[in-house]
Amino acid sequence: MLDFLAENNLCGQAILRIVSCGNAIIAEVLRLSEFIPAVFLLKDRADQQRYGDIIFDFSYFKGPEFWESKLEAKPELQDLDEEFRENNIEIVTRFYLAFQSVHKYIVDLNRYLDDLNEGVYIQQTLETVLLSEDGKQLLCEALYLYGVMLLVIDQKIEGEVRERMLVSYYRYSAARSSADSNMDDICKLLRSTGYSSQPGAKRPPNYPESYFQRVPINETFISMVIGRLRSDDIYNQVSAYPLPEHRSTALANQAAMLYVILYFEPSILHTHQAKMREIVDKYFPDNWVISIYMGITVNLADAWEPYKAAKTALNNTLDLANVKEQASRYASVSDRVRAQVQQFLKEGYLREEVLLDNIPRLLNCLRDCNVAIRWLMLHTADSACDPNNKRLRQIKDQILADSRYNPKILFQLLLDTAQFEFILKEMFKQMLSEKQSKWEHYKKEGSERMTELADVFSGVKPLTRVEKNENLQAWFREISKQILSLNYDDSTAAGRKTVQLIQALEEVQEFHQLESNLQVCQFLADTRKFLHQMIRTINIKEEVLITVQIIGDLSFAWQLIDSFTSIMQESIRVNPSMVTKLRATFLKLASALDLPLLRINQANSPDLLSVSQYYSGELVSYVRKVLQIIPESMFTSLLKIIKLQTHDIMEVPTRLDKDKLRDYAQLGPRYEVAKLTHAISIFTEGILMMKTTLVGIIKVDPKQLLEDGIRKELVKRVAFALHRGLIFNPRAKPSELMPKLKELGATMDGFHRSFEYIQDYVSIYGLKIWQEEVSRIINYNVEQECNNFLRTKIQDWQSMYQSTHIPIPKFAPVDESITFIGRLCREILRITDPKMTCYIDQLNTWYDVKTHQEVTSSRLFSEIQTTLGTFGLNGLDRLLCFMIVKELQNFLSMFQKIILKERTVQETLKMLMSAVNPLKSIVANSSKVYLSAITKTQKIWSAYLEAIMKVGQMQILRQQIANELNSSCRFDSRHLAAALDNLNKALLADIEAHYRDPSLPYPKEDNTLLYEITAYLEAAGIHNPLNKIYITTKRLPYFPIVNFLFLIAQLPKLQYNKNLGMVCRKPADPVDWPPLVLGLLTLLKQFHSRYTEQFLALIGQFIRSTMEQCTSQKMPEMPADAVGALLFLEDYVRYTKLPRRVAEAHVPNFIFDEFRTVL
């Protein structure tokens, strides 16, 4: 009969593919369960209020039109819905595909069963497939995996969350309209069951059997599979566990499958008492906590509570006398095997000959160890016992008492067993690889000895007092030939023949009285020894390794092992070399990967890589978690070193008087530093002792693990310091900004110095790590803060700064800002608010409008540079850019609302435009014309002024940041600054040349050079924020004249001061000149340059008209508004770095030259 799994056996390949797919689906569900977007949980009140109207459960399907019309009625809800779609469609689609594949899985399995029944596979029926060993295994696995899939989904992704995701996918995806979409079936299968994995949650009635019956499955198939599982040892595991008391462990995998599959036929659990008694007697006579898949544990006492027959059958097992007997038995077993294993692990005990002579004994010890570990770990696990269930608590308490349970001792047994297994496997692999060469070597040696003896008896080779004996000579030659004729490939015949040869050599010694000659005896003894070695060597079989692999299975502890983390970490802290022992435990745990990967591998499925990566990644993450205690302990010592170095140890001067040497010696503190440094290097040594290890398919390099661990701890501490250090009280007078920055600067400096100090002792590049991680923390926080301003937000899993191995912690917001960088930015904006302060450009300083006291100055940015570095300033700059964009967008919507929709305003503007046209002329009766327009539009300017001043304020801050970045770059990185400057000038020259002559080259759209160089230039402060285009704009009617009117409406609130320029006239009605100028300049920069030209022409006309009126009325002084307008033009030209002739085109140059002299 054709091999069931042969590639040309379509029937076998089809079911193998289904099972392979099942394992891959479970891995995908487990992977996705860690990425459920928080909004779908609707846990906190803020999410409920914000998203409650756009995230629906299945009640949506009762009347989709009603819900959609509710959305359409509110434009802001539509906007939010669209934003939510853009941010979540990718992850929701991924979840939907996983749900779809679960449904497809059961559809495929049902189709396969139908094909079998209809004879699609020639000569194959359900019965014949179940007769084949592989077929029987695969059919049982196919149904079992479907059950596991459903249970895992319900455990990891709550029913309500699934419903919300499915509805969201239905609403947002175009796929719903396609004819082949099976959305309805998927929704029916995965609708909420009412089950909750929260502790203390009640189990819904008829759960999980009603859930398992949502898609009907062939009943004959279910009952035949249950029949096979009840009667057969489908995986032939009993051969690996010959002792009857290990029977339930041997059948544990099969028991887990039966447990799951029984829910497909719940009548057995309810009423078939005889069947349930048979099942319990075979599979659960001494155990009731089982692992069903990759460490998911179930307590049968709880799970079978609602089922009469199952509960009755299990009562014998759960009888307190039986519980006591089992717990006591495993207590004595674990005591016995612990001593045995420790004996085996003694240095030098496990040698090759000991191993070869004691294989059965060693394997028995391993079996006992693993069975005891399994029973104790499962039956004492917290996850398997509901603390609210009195009976379960009572059983568990009895186990803990009777087994004298001590988690440290159990963990030690696990460590020793893993180490013992590891050594045994390594030795066996070594022996198997050398098996043939050694066997041939022993054969050659034995044969040569016999040839030499034959020569001795021939009389040719003289040996003391050995007489010539032709018979013996011929006999030894024959034996030599017989030894040479032994064939390695026919091990059975060779073994039998070798035994006969040993007997013959013993007999020849007795019959011919050869004992009298010691040398002949020695030759015979040596040959017998070589023949014995040949028998031993030929008995080294791979079956031993397979048995060790089977009995060493630790997949049941995939999740339970986490409860031992604290014990592992404590033992590492006390003795860092413990890491080498843990390596064997991690490798033992890695063997659990065989379970889900076996079928995927057999099917040559492309899922092999992703599933291996998922489980290997999970295990490596766990290894990292355990070993993180080393960096943690190092940092604890490091903090003590920092404290000693900064507070206790005095800096030794370059010149030192001899009599002061004792004062500077400070032997106590220095000894303490040396001791702590030694402890750090011991920890480093500990982790580096763990060799490079392949965990699943991921190579774990201890040096990399150490570095990642140090980075993780550094990130955790620095992120916390930044979060805690930058929380401000907005009511504090004066602001806490500078003191907090100084304090944080000292903390960061401490971290930095300690990192420099430690790098040589742990063999890492301290400065490189420091810069990479601090920049990552700051950039990530800036990204999170900027998400506030983005419609399509960057999720953590999309962020280039966030990492799974070295995660940047997130902290709950303490105010409207999400992160420390937002709080810092808003505090700076608060204290430099143009309504409260006056900015003096020549001094780069802000003063309080009322008290005239200095509020802050450019020193603030030097302090930020010292504390947060270039990354901090650059991040602040980026955040200000986003804020400016938001402010400009708000401004545009306000412009549309106030100016373009108010009829009175429009009429006023029309009248003014007709009065001022043409712009080259002089407006007759100008003061009246302008005053009338200002008066009619007075109410719109307050909101306008606020927006313009905010933009101007942020532009001043950006200028200050650029100056600070540029000066620090020129000091600290002269060559970089010069190179960037040159490259920038060269690029600009090339671009200008292209515009003069289009045949010259120009960077194409797909060329990222300009984007990349811009990032560098902004980080080095080589840019002018005033030239930046922040938003794209359309043509706006009346735009130049509105801005002109706004400006002349503000001029009466200001006055000219010879020393300070334009300052606020009344503190009660504050207007700050620099933010006003820069705000207007920035706003105009966003539009076509002709708007700016019109705006400047209007100001020029205003100055000329006012001057004309003033001279005609023979007023001796220049009007204040004209001075203000002239100063605006002057500042405009200065800030934009334009030539003066731009202003002189609208105002005669002699007025510019002379106006200050008449003030």
Swiss-Prot record:
Component of the WASH core complex also described as WASH regulatory complex (SHRC) composed of WASH (WASHC1, WASH2P or WASH3P), WASHC2 (WASHC2A or WASHC2C), WASHC3, WASHC4 and WASHC5. The WASH core complex associates via WASHC2 with the F-actin-capping protein dimer (formed by CAPZA1, CAPZA2 or CAPZA3 and CAPZB) in a transient or substoichiometric manner which was initially described as WASH complex. Interacts with VCP, PI4K2A. GO terms for molecular function: identical protein binding. One of its GO terms (cellular component) is cytosol. Keywords: Cytoplasm, Endoplasmic reticulum, Endosome, Protein transport, Transport. Belongs to the strumpellin family. The keyword Chloroplast does not apply. It is found in: Cytoplasm, Cytosol; Endoplasmic reticulum; Early endosome. The keyword Transmembrane does not apply. It comes from Mus musculus. Acts as a component of the WASH core complex that functions as a nucleation-promoting factor (NPF) at the surface of endosomes, where it recruits and activates the Arp2/3 complex to induce actin polymerization, playing a key role in the fission of tubules that serve as transport intermediates during endosome sorting. May be involved in axonal outgrowth. Involved in cellular localization of ADRB2. Involved in cellular trafficking of BLOC-1 complex cargos such as ATP7A and VAMP7. Involved in cytokinesis and following polar body extrusion during oocyte meiotic maturation. It holds the Pfam family Strumpellin. This is WASH complex subunit 5. Its main location: cytoplasm. GO terms for biological process: cholesterol homeostasis; endosomal transport; endosome fission; exocytosis; lysosome organization; meiotic spindle assembly; oocyte maturation; phagocytosis. The gene is Washc5. InterPro entries: WASH_strumpellin. Signal peptide: none annotated.
